[in-house]
């Protein structure tokens, strides 16, 4: 019981996201009535009580906690008690299932924009499943101290594998139903076939956090440990027997595997005692003086990680009585509205004084500027907004106007673009009524672009604009937030460009740098350059097309030696910083010219004389009577602004 209550997955979630632990702790109590020799409706009723106690805290975790009981019922072919139990579960859960179904019809499709099945299942191999380190979060972040140590430290790898080995041994002495449950659990957690993963990103998206099904593995394994320990006595003298020695070793394993709990490592990073008083003062002021408008919490942050503690959710959330908005990792609003928030963030970052004009569309008349984020912020930021500034410690409150519902006296201006375009147009030309359309627009913008988005970060989340056949580097089903606007994308001419990687990739370490994409190598501007992604020290870039006796023009951003390849022929070339060099490509006519780097550097110029290869962001022609074009690089700073339209 102790090993189950303090299993690795529990230690990984407790105190950080305890809602995922609560239903799991009740799973054994659901099973218990179904272990009687003869099952009746009373057993089904008894098994329903712990399901009722799981509450509505996490629907998927509730289903997962009931799955071990379902396995036992199916194994025993106890269909009548099983049906009675299912009806009981539905009855005690109807109070939250009903609203969940109704709200699900109106909720934005946020599961498309969070962790994908490729992320949640990446570390679910057999050893990790048996050890119990099934939660994916500790593998990508050190925030959950206990979970991170259990997942990565060799000591815990050994002791958790030791417990798993004891459990497998003991399991061989138990009834077969427990072995069946273990096999089912391994199959559910460890299946890596494509159709299964695709289903977890599609109709089964609610179940993609498979670690919630850990009880299918943990219950039978720990029953096996209990069975093994029952026949392993502890030493009673200084000369223990073999069994007593094994018993002592097993006890030590049990103590060691739960050591994160008794060594005070349960709390995650950023634990805090209370929210500072200045947050209470600031929110009280807003509740009094900005009650008839919406408040923007600025700047954006994936999660609320302050210098005084990591609340994860916004510290103002339980304190504000007024409408408020923030750009965080998972805004629970429609995708177009998220794009609109991104446009507001870009406008405020570019020029706060004019960017505030984009707030009126969202009904925002007050801004909370926080200076206590872990990343650090400009203390003078609030003064750049204009408006009436009130200071409360590390939080500034700016009262702009009491913006509410906006009414336009004329028909809206039709805009071909994404939600972000509305905010940018407001910032530059002033707010007015505008409508997003996909054709016959009065204003044509270069948004949205075909891009990859790393939904897991707000620090350089968007790649450079891409061509239709460029590979995606993100695992989500949707490359970016969908939009009503026509898609601007890179069109290639004279051939194509392929690269080993790019610092402009959405998944590049440290965030995407759109000015370092493959397009930058062939844009005719020496101020921009393609760079391989950080960590790609042997990168390459390749021109593909039909080249006759090609002469290559090449320029690097630093002194380096590159290898120019064409088929089986190759030549090494020494380059000086920002000095163009012409090279006769070995091998004659070719369909591919590759430049291999000897170390990570930028390629500012790459082209074949008289046979240019181009990549240009092209705005689709959907509006023959357009009155105005609006192009920008605030959302994706590509270094230069080149558009074909």
Q: Where do the language-model regions lie?
A:
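A short beta-strand element within beta-rich, extracytoplasmic domains
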Residues: 525, 541, 546-559, 595
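Membrane-helix boundary/interfacial segments in multi-pass membrane proteins
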Residues: 10-21, 113-121, 144-155, 183-224, ...
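Membrane-interface junctions at the ends of membrane-embedded or membrane-associated helices
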Residues: 35-45, 74-81, 172-173, 218-248
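Extracytoplasmic/lumenal acceptor-recognition loop(s) of multi-pass membrane glycoenzymes
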Residues: 290-358, 447-526, 629-644
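Extracytoplasmic
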Residues: 245-327, 421, 428-436
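Membrane-interface helix-loop junctions at the exits of transmembrane helices
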Residues: 1-17, 92-108, 121-140, 168-211, ...
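Periplasmic/ER-lumenal interhelical loops and adjacent helix-loop junctions
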Residues: 88-170, 210, 432-486, 493, ...
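Membrane-embedded helix bundles of polyisoprenyl
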Residues: 1-75, 82-100, 250-261, 295
